[in-house]
């Protein structure tokens, strides 16, 4: 009887663990069939506790993989340079990629759950525009990722880049519609990387460097509530989180810019 009771308890615990994995990884069934041949890996995922890292732990992994991260960075810079893509007032597009990854460096510990996800997170940041802007296909990105990462890591990294690729559309709204945002919400780390992308764009546009970015600043301001709502899956899984610290950094950029405009007398309420 004792053995039977223990078996029931263990079975119930395993069932609860399986349930937590479905919450942890919404497309777990697809993932299961993709990696069904690697039973040991599946067991490790099921039994692995979901947690985020301390900042020092994340920083130690950044230092450990610094050479690989730099190689990924250089390859992404060269890719966008090869299609003559620039950013803002004729800056190299790598300037933007570095800003996006700075957000990952600053806040990645708030979403990253294991060492094996560190490199895919950085790859996703550096290659997030590779399909949309640099003429790569999904399979092209996967091939590049396999040159730096394991098969499992390459899949995760490529999924992030794919999720952040705009849809076909005539307008900005069509290119970033519900299908696009749903893809972000369903992909591990994609909401966070997209938030870092928006933080980078807003930080630059609020610097007042050129007329186009001044225009985009107003677009980003108007989009902000809708944007945050659309990329937030409201998940308990840390990999899908929008860290409050990152959102606050973004808000600080807009507040600082508003205060600057007020000092310069450029806000609409001056004179009333």
Predicted segments with their positions:
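Active-site helical microenvironments for divalent-metal-assisted chemistry
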Residues: 46-272
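Intrinsically disordered, low-complexity proline-rich regions
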Residues: 8, 24-26
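Short, positively charged low-complexity motifs
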Residues: 5-8, 19, 52
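Short, positively charged and aromatic/hydrophobic N-terminal segments
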Residues: 19, 24, 35-37, 41-49
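Cationic, low-complexity basic patches in intrinsically disordered or flexible, solvent-exposed regions
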Residues: 31
């Amino acid at each position: 009887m004792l053995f039977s009771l223990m078996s029931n308890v263990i079975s119930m615990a395993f069932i609860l663990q399986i349930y937590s994995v479905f919450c942890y990884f919404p497309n777990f069934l697809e993932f299961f069939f993709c990696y069904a041949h690697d039973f040991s890996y599946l067991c490790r995922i099921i039994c692995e506790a979901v947690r985020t890292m301390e900042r020092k732990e994340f920083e130690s992994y950044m230092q450990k993989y610094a050479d690989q991260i730099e190689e990924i960075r250089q390859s992404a810079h060269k890719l966008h340079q090869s299609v003559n893509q620039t950013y803002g007032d004729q800056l190299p597009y790598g300037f933007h990629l570095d800003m996006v990854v700075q957000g990952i460096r600053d806040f990645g510990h708030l979403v990253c759950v294991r060492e094996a996800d560190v490199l895919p997170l950085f790859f996703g940041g550096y290659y997030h525009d590779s399909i949309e802007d640099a003429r790569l296909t999904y399979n092209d990105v996967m091939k590049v990722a396999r040159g730096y990462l394991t098969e499992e890591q390459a899949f995760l990294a490529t999924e992030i880049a794919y999720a952040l690729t705009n849809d076909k559309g005539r307008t900005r709204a069509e290119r970033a519609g519900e299908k696009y945002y749903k893809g972000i919400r369903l992909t591990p780390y994609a909401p966070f990387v997209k938030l870092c992308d928006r933080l980078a764009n807003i930080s630059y546009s609020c610097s007042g460097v050129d007329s186009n970015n001044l225009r985009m600043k107003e677009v980003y301001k108007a989009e902000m509530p809708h944007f945050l709502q659309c990329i937030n899956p409201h998940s308990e899984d840390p990999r899908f989180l929008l860290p409050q610290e990152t959102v606050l950094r973004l808000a600080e950029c807009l507040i600082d810019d508003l205060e600057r405009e007020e000092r310069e007398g450029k806000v609409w309420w001056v004179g009333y």
